From Swiss-Prot:
Subunit structure: Homodimer.
Membership in a protein family: Belongs to the glycosyl hydrolase 2 family. Beta-mannosidase A subfamily.
InterPro entries in the record: Beta-gal/glucu_dom_sf, Beta-mannosidase-like_N2, Beta-mannosidase_GH2, Beta-mannosidase_Ig, Galactose-bd-like_sf, Glyco_hydro_2_Ig-like, Glycoside_hydrolase_SF, Ig-like_fold
Subcellular localization(s) per the UniProt record: Secreted
Keywords: Carbohydrate metabolism, Glycoprotein, Glycosidase, Hydrolase, Polysaccharide degradation, Secreted, Signal
Keyword Glycoprotein: yes
Protein name: Beta-mannosidase A
Reactions the enzyme catalyzes: Hydrolysis of terminal, non-reducing beta-D-mannose residues in beta-D-mannosides
GO molecular function: beta-mannosidase activity
Length: 932
């Protein structure tokens, strides 16, 4: 970062200027070259970048779209050597010079002026090196900086084969493609995962700087930990909302911290500029290169920050300055933040809750500013296989889709990478809570001293770096370590199980937990993404948190759930879904659209079982460096096929590309319906004994063009899933629950409002021509409802056998809700509408009719009008051509004959003209079965 040359000296001594004489050179300037001995090539390079990107830019790699698993030549060590950097003769005149690297991926040897100045071995750490003396003795006319990157797969293998490498029972560690990822601190999915490629890139993936201070009193800010919490707040206990706000600021600096420093702060509304508070920080301390101070915001009430759908995202700019004994500013930094408390409640169910009908056990839900809320969202993976391609504009489009989809929380999955600050900034602005995790996933990890020391530095840096963001919701130790890896090692080595539990606790509880709590009081920590919670916490104990593990009681509920079932015969059997307090992962994979496949695959390969398409399906992963493991990939293709054939019309079009497109769409229908069934089930749990308060499906978006669990494709196009999730994440919904074995049908209204809501549910039976069924098939036409705050209520139940539709294959029940209530923090009542549907047979068995859809575009309103003229249109689907990123305001809906629906299209990137508008199409389930 560049030091901001702004001061707040008026707080102390108006006449004194800041200490000057600092020069920061951003190394993102042109002039770098990349050389690879393995490829015997030298090409222009960039910083930030990764070697694959530079080789692609130079034409060494013909097309990024054709990359399947890896390039043999790029498995070799690669080097990065810049052109000579003429930094100017003033460099030698400065008192001190440092090299600062915000992120190097991963193993490097760094040379400056022909001298080795250091090495790095952790992708997630910030590194800095004092090169003052090296520069003064430099004999080069223009100092040359060279960074040599080693091959992460080769180094991981070398560590694994070393004499002191820890070993685990056979069959426990999960190799996706490259082995031994658990030995190194690099993005774990770079070695392959079931939703992405294994490129194992190398390069300077974040910015780098040369920092020079001419004045020895000047400091450079490396990192800032800004912690805002209620007085008396402790991480794992609910904060007292009546207490004053505490602002604790800690700055990590380069340079010599002056004796007796003071600190000042100014807090301004980020939008109006109105000053909330300003003055000196108290209890200023110096520890190593960190300066820390604290203040209490007494007598002032900042505007609170709320997640999407719960209120405003009020933000404040906090300027923190360090002063020397002459009251001169020697370091200054500004961070944008918000005032909120976020708390993961894992405490035991209280007597009051038991009296309300909540089942015994322990809570597992989030509370924002003291209020329980329903977490609606998904899991976010790395948006690209190469982080330098992830830009602010790209992430803004993605997060706009998140908020448009009625989501308020994303789980930042481990093991990708810790998110950039600009991504947290966007989440702050848009009200998206980010459940964040340390980068450990689906593996057991070493616990030797060197590994733990490396991890400790990684944890401290990243906790401090992102702590000021109000969107930060949680720190979790890793992905599925407790729920997947410990059971696996227990089965593999029952006698040695205690050893591995001890190692788990050593890393995630004895090491990471205290480091988190030492650097923040505002965020809760959980050792694993999926857990039964804890029994008790004693921060002075060697193992400060005692996990519950399997110490559970029948009839009680604990923790969160993680659920995948690829047996498609039970996909819609909600008795198979887990009953818990919170669902953090669940899902099924589907194909991307034809338009997305065309970005990456040659036209000749556009059919369902082509080798290119099959091998892009990494469910199931190759299990090693086998680029042609058709057997594993075909299993995933078979699961999607079974999902379609079990429930939907089987596409059989004469045109092969059209048939491929129809099959891709069919897999999306199955995926969307399966997620809808589960989300409805979990949301209904808010009013059940389990008191279920969270649904985060797997996964939000894609990292490349391939069959995955994503709801948003690689370029931003929405699958059917994201439209359906948007609908079923509305504040108040009506949902049918059908036990297709017994025939029992139940209808529930679910609300995530914080106050009771009232309204009416209309039930209308029609046949597939759109005609009303006599007597409404024995169902009442209208039912009033009243649903409690953050709750669910049943409004109707019957057995389908007791109803009177004349032909189950020619019947559909339309459920329409109209209600009123107050949105969270709203002062006026709002109207809510929701529509759902139920068919007493699966879609493949319906007596479908051609709805004869008509589509018109109005250039004045820039909207599309869809009309069904001859029958009920199921899964009405508007599709748009390539060249634009955007989404329709509604999609995947039911349309009765004679009804018109006006729908807008939101353009996120690109532009549209009348030719493009005329290329928009509309289809329905009928078109899936029609042979063209």
């Amino acid at each position: 970062m560049r030091i901001r040359e702004q001061t707040i000296l008026a707080l102390l001594s108006p006449g004194l200027p800041p200490v000057t004489g600092q020069h920061v050179l951003d190394l993102s300037e042109p002039g770098w070259t990349v050389s690879s001995k393995a490829l015997n090539r030298t090409v222009p390079g960039r910083l930030p970048s990764q070697v694959h990107l530079d080789l692609f830019e130079a034409g060494v790699i013909a097309t990024m779209g054709s990359m399947i698993l890896t390039f043999a030549g790029l498995r070799m060590p690669t080097g990065r050597t810049p052109a000579t950097l003429l930094l100017g003769c003033e460099l030698t005149d400065h008192e001190s010079t440092w090299l600062v690297f915000d992120g190097l991926d991963t193993f490097t040897t760094i040379t400056f002026c022909d001298q080795i100045i250091g090495s790095t071995y952790n992708q997630f750490r910030q590194y800095h090196f004092d090169v003052s003396q090296v520069l003064k003795e430099c004999k080069q006319e223009g100092p040359v900086l060279s960074i040599n990157f080693g091959s992460a797969p080769n180094i991981a293998n070398a560590i694994a084969n070393g004499p002191s490498a820890e070993e685990w029972p056979a069959g426990v560690q999960i190799t996706n493609e490259y082995p031994n990822r658990w030995y190194i601190r690099k993005e774990q999915s770079d070695f392959g995962w079931d939703w992405g490629p294994a490129f194992a890139p190398a390069g300077p993936w974040k910015p780098a700087y040369i920092v020079q201070n001419k004045n020895p009193d000047r400091l450079y800010v490396l990192n800032t930990d800004l912690d805002i919490y209620r007085r008396g707040q402790i991480n794992h206990l609910p904060p007292d909302q009546s207490q004053s706000w505490v602002v604790n600021a800690s700055i990590d600096v380069l340079g010599s911290v002056p004796q007796w420093p003071s600190m000042s702060v100014e807090i301004k509304d980020a939008y109006s500029g109105v000053v909330l508070s300003s003055g000196l920080l108290e209890n200023v301390t110096v520890s190593g290169n960190s300066v820390t101070g604290v203040t209490v915001v007494d007598g002032r009430t900042p505007k609170l920050w709320w997640p999407n759908g719960m209120g405003d995202q009020s933000l404040y700019n906090v300027t923190i300055a360090v002063h020397n004994h002459r009251n001169q500013v020697v370091a200054e930094v500004m961070k944008r933040t918000g005032f909120r408390t976020i708390f993961l409640n894992q405490r035991n169910i209280t007597e009051e809750q038991l009296a309300q009908g909540v089942a015994p056990g322990a809570n597992w839900h989030f509370e924002i500013n003291g209020r329980e809320f329903y977490a609606k969202g998904s899991n976010i993976i790395p948006p690209d296989a190469f982080w330098p391609r992830v830009t602010p504009s790209r992430m803004e489009r993605l997060f706009d889709a998140v908020t448009a989809g009625n989501q308020n929380m994303l789980r930042v999955w481990a093991s990708g990478a810790y998110l950039h600050d600009f991504i947290y900034d966007l989440a702050d602005e848009k009200g998206i809570l980010l459940w964040s995790e340390f980068q450990f996933s689906d593996a057991l990890y070493p616990v030797d001293d060197a590994f733990l020391e490396n991890v400790a530095a990684e944890v401290v840096y990243n906790v401090r770096r992102v702590n000021h963001h109000p969107s930060l919701a949680l720190w979790a130790g890793g992905n599925e370590i407790e729920s997947l890896m410990l059971p696996m090692v227990r089965r593999a080595d029952h006698k040695g199980y205690a050893k591995y539990v001890g190692e788990y606790e050593k890393l995630y509880i004895s090491l990471i937990l205290p480091l988190v709590y030492e650097n923040t009081r505002s965020i809760t920590y959980s050792p694993s993404s999926t857990t039964e919670g804890y029994l008790h916490v004693n921060l002075s104990a060697p193992v400060p948190m005692t996990e519950r593990y399997s110490n559970t009681t029948p009839g009680s509920y604990y923790g969160d759930t993680d659920y995948y079932n690829y047996d498609t015969s039970v996909s819609f059997n909600y008795h198979k879904y887990p009953v818990g307090r919170f669902a953090n992962e669940f899902g099924f994979h589907s194909m991307p659209s034809l338009q997305t496949w065309q970005q990456a695959v040659d036209p000749k390969d556009l059919y369902f079982n082509s080798s290119v398409v099959v091998l892009r399906n990494h469910h199931y992963t190759a299990g090693g460096l086998f680029t042609d493991n058709y057997q594993n990939s075909s299993r995933g293709m078979g699961e999607m096929t079974m999902g379609v054939e079990s429930y939907y019309p089987i596409p059989s079009k004469s045109d092969p590309v059209a048939n491929f497109s129809a099959w891709c769409h069919a897999t999306q229908l199955f995926q969307a319906d399966m997620y809808k069934a589960q989300i409805q089930f979990y949301r209904r749990g808010s009013g059940m004994p389990e008191r279920q308060l969270g649904s985060l499906y797997w996964q939000l978006e894609d990292t490349w063009q391939a069959p995955t669990w994503a709801g948003i494709e690689y370029d931003g196009r929405w699958k059917m899933l994201h439209y359906v999730a948007r609908d079923i994440y509305e504040p108040i919904i009506v949902s049918p629950f059908w036990n297709y074995t017994t025939g029992d049908l139940e209808v529930y209204v679910t609300s995530d409002l914080w106050e009771p809501a009232q309204g009416t549910v209309n039930l209308t039976w029609v046949d597939l021509s759109g005609k009303s069924i006599a007597g409404n098939a024995g169902t009442p036409e209208s039912i009033p409802f009243s649903v409690g705050a953050l709750n669910a209520t049943d409004v109707y139940s019957a057995n389908v056998a007791d109803l009177s539709p004349p032909d189950l294959t020619d019947s559909i029940l339309i459920l329409s809700l109209a209600g009123e209530g107050y949105l969270p923090n709203a002062r006026t009542r709002s109207e809510f509408r929701h529509e759902n549907q139920f068919t007493p047979v699966f879609p493949k068995d319906l007596a479908l009719r051609d709805p004869k859809l008509e589509l018109a575009y109005n250039p004045d309103t820039r909207t599309f009008t869809v009309e069904a003229t001859a029958g009920v249109s199921l899964y009405t689907w508007l599709d748009y051509p390539a060249g634009v990123v955007g989404y329709f305001e509604q999609n995947g809906f039911v349309l009765l004959p004679g009804m018109k629906k006006e729908i807008g299209f939101v353009v996120q990137e690109g532009s549209v003209d009348e030719d493009w508008m005329r290329s928009v199409t509309v289809t329905s389930l009928w078109d899936q079965k029609v042979r063209e």
